[in-house]
Amino acid sequence: MSSLNTRARAVFSAAVEGVHPDMVVRRGLERHGDKLHVGGQSFTLTNNLYLVGFGKAVLGMAAEAERIVGDHLIKGVVSVPHGIQNTLRSHGKEKMLLESNSRITVMEGAKHNLPDTDAQKSAECIRDLASSLTEKDLLLVLISGGGSALLPAPAPPMSLQEKQDVTRKLAAAGATIQELNTVRRALSLLKGGGLAQCASPAKVVALILSDVIGDPLDLIASGPTVRSDSSPEEVWAILDNYKLSDSLPSSVKEVLSKSISGQGSGVKNQPQEVKDNVLNVVIGSNTIALECASRKASELGLRPVILSPGVCGDVRSVARLYGLLSSFACSPGKEPPPELAAEILKLGPEVGIESWDLCRTMNVLVGERKEGWGATCLLAGGEPTVKLSGKGRGGRNQELAMRVGLELSQGEVKSGAVFLSGGTDGQDGPTEAAGAVADGELKEEAASQGLDTDSFLANNDSFTFFSKLSEGRRLLNPGLTGTNVMDVHVMLLPPSPQKDLQ
């Protein structure tokens, strides 16, 4: 393994460590005596603290929060994925589990990341706790990815099955994710600010670990502490647009009708005092992970540049962009060819990257050529997509690494660049790996071992490919991390040939 390969792995590890549940809670929540400091505000603790949480990472968050607040915590309930306590235990992550004398009740549900009756019971317990609070109380809400499925609370008289049927039909009809979330929030007691409304007049502090590009508070776990700006009329318009209004169950119509008349709790119209009593703080995100990675890169003697935390779109386009950026950085001569810059800027919108971010990044790469800074560490993150055409085993990170490796192998002279793509949760698709590391030698290495890259890609079989290639040495295997802020991309670019010409 090359020196750049080793450093790329170290940079990725630093990104993940920086958004571990205990780490983000320690950074976001400080206690000095009976004062709790969070998000620039201070709250007085008088044995008046309650805690609720929902999401795949909240168990570790809750364990650290309880360590910080101590005996001021009266009671708590967290809704977590089915089997997660045993999974964490088997992966040696006991630190993410609650102590045996914890005041927090752990409830498991949402098998296969789908709302179910177990998760609904958890949501009811969370709602009951929030509804019991007074103006003297403080409710700490812990939220992470997967929280929406772990907090199903259909507005009565609607059943969970009826609510799921509506959203399933909308999805099948081609509704956008924004439209789905608008309807989902409208039909829920707790989403779209409903939990904050239940807890009123208590003060509410939400600590959020974001797994959504751009960290939109209303979309993370469907925004239980964020007032929904959608009107009942908007919800009806969406249902009308997809010709579902007439076929709605009577219970769903009743919920929406009550919302229009102001009697229900579907679409939330929170009074000002509820909004004033809520503090939402994003304590972990892809941006924070990239900042931690950047610091590690500097320690390792690399020059870091953060491209964007919002990379999305098809992995083929994303791979092409990284290939172009490598060519731009490593092309011989005093200046990169201007047509490369034009192609990079043209591709940016397809993969969710602003032109300003691309121009800023290219300026840094040009500066490296002129000043001879040494190796550059290009950092990005997000959630690209893969169009499935085969039935192999793989994930978007392994497929992206594979495709970037093929991009880097093009041309007469290999740049020496190294690319890593990894999921911060430690699991890329239905595989044991988080991702993989690739470079310009990938295609030649595969061919020498009788592996046809094109056939593996056609079958979406990137995990099998990397497992067979050089005995799996290119795979990224951090194990279960207990966190999730989407993916991290690391591309290490060696000094340009121009440095050697000076």
UniProtKB/Swiss-Prot annotation:
Catalyses which reaction(s): (R)-glycerate + ATP = (2R)-3-phosphoglycerate + ADP + H(+)
SUPFAM superfamilies per UniProt: GckA/TtuD-like
Molecular-function GO terms, alphabetical: ATP binding; glycerate kinase activity
Enzyme Commission numbers on file: 2.7.1.31
GO cellular component: cytoplasm
InterPro entries in alphabetical order: GK-like_C_sf, GK_N_sf, MOFRL, MOFRL_assoc_dom, MOFRL_protein
Location in or out of the cell: Cytoplasm
Keywords carried by this UniProt record: ATP-binding, Cytoplasm, Kinase, Nucleotide-binding, Transferase
Pfam families reported for this sequence: DUF4147, MOFRL
GO biological process, one term: protein phosphorylation
Similarity remark: Belongs to the glycerate kinase type-2 family.
Name of the protein in question: Glycerate kinase
Gene that produces this protein: glyctk
